[in-house]
Structures are given as C-alpha cells and as structure tokens.
Curated annotation (Swiss-Prot):
This is UPF0299 membrane protein YohJ. It is found in: Cell inner membrane. It comes from Escherichia coli O157:H7. It is a multi-pass membrane protein. The keyword Cell inner membrane applies. Belongs to the UPF0299 family. The chain crosses the membrane at residues 7-27, 31-51, 63-83, 93-113. InterPro entries: LrgA/CidA (IPR005538), Uncharacterised_UPF0299 (IPR022957). Keywords: Cell inner membrane, Cell membrane, Membrane, Transmembrane, Transmembrane helix. GO terms for cellular component: plasma membrane. Residues 28-30, 84-92 are cytoplasmic. It comes from the Bacteria. Residues 1-6, 52-62, 114-132 are periplasmic.
C-alpha cells in the first residue's frame, strides 16, 4: 500500500508542478501588453526552474513520461478542428505552402548563421594542411 501511495504521490506532484507552471504562464500572459501564449510562457517558467535546478527533474519526470506517451492522442482534437476549415485551406493551399517553404528556409538560415556565430570556425583535430 505504501508503494502505491508513493507512486500516486509522484504522479500527482508531477502534474501539479506542470500545471502550476502552465497557469502561472497564463496569468503572466494576461498581464502583458503583447500577445504571447500563456502555455509558451509556462514552458519557459518550467525550463528556467529546471535549468537553475530550483525544481528537481525527478519531480516532473513521471508526468512528462505520461504526457509524451499520449501526445499523439492530444493532437486529435486539433486535427478535427482544422478540418472544419478544409475548404478555406484548399482555397489558400498555394500561399500556405509558399509561406511554409519560405519560413522553413528563413529558420534554416537563421539557425545556421547563429550556430556559426556562437561556435565560430573550429579546427578539426587530425585535419592536415590547416596548420597556419
């Protein structure tokens, strides 16, 4: 019985912490003058708490495993909601594809540029002919 209560406590604690960060993000988003989704702010709060080791990762792991395991199921309502606008999407298929392609290219270029900026040019160990 004690082991069962311990497992229930771990899952309950994980979900309470994840939802606390989510609702803190929603609250902060309601105070901001710009529109930023509260879920994004909540994820950033959770990330900062984990990165600064204020919140031990083992406290949120059980809840994260459950959410990741059933993530595909959580996208079903979104897919059904998008299908309500199928005619609009079909009419605007060209611009949607072009904007997706352009935004993918822009993201690729920005990530490659920022990676080059952060990491710089590095000498490959064992590379011949690069000793100057």
């Amino acid at each position: 019985m004690s082991k069962t209560l311990n497992i229930i406590w771990q899952y309950l604690r994980a979900f309470v912490l994840i939802y606390a960060c989510l609702y803190a993000g929603i609250f902060i988003a309601s105070l901001l003058p710009v529109t930023i989704p509260g879920s994004i702010i909540g994820m950033l709060i959770l990330f900062v708490l984990l990165a600064l080791q204020i919140l031990p990762a083992k406290w949120v792991n059980p809840g994260c495993y459950v959410l990741i395991r059933y993530m595909a199921l959580l996208f079903v309502p979104i897919g059904v909601g998008v299908m309500q606008y199928f005619d609009l999407l079909r009419a605007q298929f060209g611009p949607v594809v072009v904007s997706c392609a352009i935004s993918t290219l822009v993201v690729f270029l920005v990530v490659s540029w920022s990676s080059q900026l952060v990491h710089g040019e590095r000498k490959v160990v064992g590379q011949k002919g690069s000793e100057e």
